[in-house]
């Protein structure tokens, strides 16, 4: 198989020129892909990219599940991430491409909060799959961005374009939360896998002074991006990975305390705590009782 070249695009103007689009603003563009002239190669953009595809939602590379909508699919790319060619072209025959340079959002609320839109760090197969109503709202937001781009550039342009983009991303945050809900059964399976993974982590003594496995460690074994794993765990349990792991540690400690042969200091050591005091504080915080008190009440 011949490996397709990757075209590095550093500016919005280069992006417009490459796809046959007129540049309306040097730091942002919204392109109708049905009218674009896409070269047969992969792209690596030096700016944020949002791709809404109206066709090809069956493509398994975007990770659509049986319980997902199929009105449209959206993927989000941070600066420097490549969008790979599928077949002959990297983009579908219909859809929209929104691109905005980091310089556009400097000093804006979007610039200060861009890290909260964690889906820019998701894998392509963790894409957002829209219902028809959600698709209409996303397209409406992109049309509003396009309308502002067509306005003559003035001192209000930067803030207004940024606000329109921020509104689109806020809707996408809502839609991702909805997708977590409709993927409830799939998410339960991932949580069960996470529980088994953490139980094995504890059983094999891997903590060894490390109080918590990282999101990178767990997500790699679950074949997820670290940020998607973090967001899924937070949505389903309300906990971050280190908080969830502490619950698992205390759960395991509670079982070990049922045996009088297990000394509290030995339990703390086996579970990877630096000392008994650290273990006892956490155990009391979660259960409301000190380890020895817990042992007495349970026996």
Where are these regions (language model features)?
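Conserved metal-binding segment of the jelly-roll/cupin
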Residues: 69-83, 99-102
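Append "Primarily bacterial transcriptional regulators
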Residues: 72, 217-224, 229, 233, ...
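Generic protein-terminus/edge-of-domain signal
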Residues: 1-68
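A short, Lys/Arg-enriched amphipathic alpha-helix from helix-turn-helix/homeodomain DNA-binding modules
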Residues: 162, 184-222, 243-262
